A protein has these predicted regions:
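Acidic, polar-rich low-complexity tracts and alpha-helical solenoid repeat scaffolds
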Residues: 20-305
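Sec-dependent bacterial lipoprotein signal peptides
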Residues: 1-20
Length: 305
């Protein structure tokens, strides 16, 4: 009887796997069909349909490390053609970050640099991308004049350039942050970490970029940077603080209380002896309460004593 049950379950698994593979192959066939339409001169609506097919595939089959970076690159190239540069940038960054070891990554890097240089007019980010590409993809210097020329440009190393920007963010004695320089630092640190993820200074730069994003109240970017640090550099010494501050940002600034609760609980389970543990317990106990409610709870505790 057990043998029959095992064989039945095995058959179910094989049928399910075959169905999934069939769906995936069908999705690829539909993409190929739409690519042929676009190659024959599709209008913007037709092009956008193909973009959505690419993105749907990468969402539905994230484990396909061969097709996904190629599809993300093609989606970005089409969005570039449609003048949708922010979306193109986002898809290129996703392709590089999630599929860094893919052979198409250098192409994504070069198109990303083109967007920052020619379309977004962010020359600092563009030059940092080229410096990082020269570090991480030295083979590009043999084929790309931009990459080769950046090596002889006389620019200081990226970490030094970003340190200079960080020191210039507070130009006067008022303590007010220079928003343009803050944005330069956040973007510069992000693209450097993206292109040269193994750089010695990358974890510290991401941490400082997250702090800067929080200072200028770019809270969604703050969470993104903390997640990047926590997920990719778990052994970095400031990861506990990053996890706590992620929870605090979700709690205090974004009011996403259930997400904050999960982060505080994870922080306390992982780092119960951390310097921020008492703060996390207090914030968890008082999650969602107003200042008045917290004061009243103090008064009630004192009265009981």
């Amino acid at each position: 009887m057990k043998t029959i049950s095992y064989l039945f379950c095995a058959c179910i698994w094989v049928v399910g796997l075959s169905a999934c593979q069939g769906e995936q192959q069908h999705a690829q066939s539909e993409i190929s069909r739409q690519e042929a339409v676009v190659e024959n001169g599709g209008d913007p609506e037709t092009v956008n349909t193909l973009v959505q097919q690419y993105l749907a595939y990468t969402t539905n089959y994230p484990e396909d490390s061969e097709a996904n970076p190629r599809y993300l690159y093609r989606a970005a190239a089409l969005q570039y053609r449609l003048n949708n540069y922010d979306a193109a940038r986002n898809n290129l960054e996703k392709a590089i970050r999630e599929y860094y070891d893919n052979e198409n990554t250098p192409n994504s890097v070069l198109l990303l640099e083109d967007i920052y240089q020619d379309k977004l007019k962010d020359r600092m980010a563009s030059s940092i991308i080229m410096q990082a590409a020269a570090e991480s993809f030295p083979e590009l210097a043999n084929h790309q004049e931009k990459v080769a020329s950046i090596q002889n440009s006389g620019l200081a190393p990226v970490a030094q350039r970003l340190d200079a920007v960080a020191r210039a963010m507070y130009p006067d004695t008022t303590g007010r942050i220079d928003l343009r320089r803050a944005n330069d630092f956040i973007t510069g640190a992000s693209v450097y970490a993206l292109i040269s993820p193994d750089g010695d200074q990358v974890p510290e730069l991401l941490y400082k970029a997250a702090e800067t994003a929080r200072t200028v109240q770019a809270f969604t970017k703050t969470i993104e940077l903390y997640d990047w640090l926590i997920d990719h550099y778990p052994d970095f010494e400031k990861v506990p603080q990053a996890m706590f501050l992620k929870g605090f940002t979700l709690d205090n600034d974004l009011r996403r209380l259930e997400e904050a609760r999960a982060i505080y609980e994870d922080f306390l389970a992982t780092y119960p002896q951390d310097d921020f543990a008492d703060d996390a317990r207090f914030l968890l106990d008082n999650l969602g309460k107003t200042d008045e409610e917290i004061i009243q709870s103090f008064d009630g505790t004192q009265a009981e004593q």
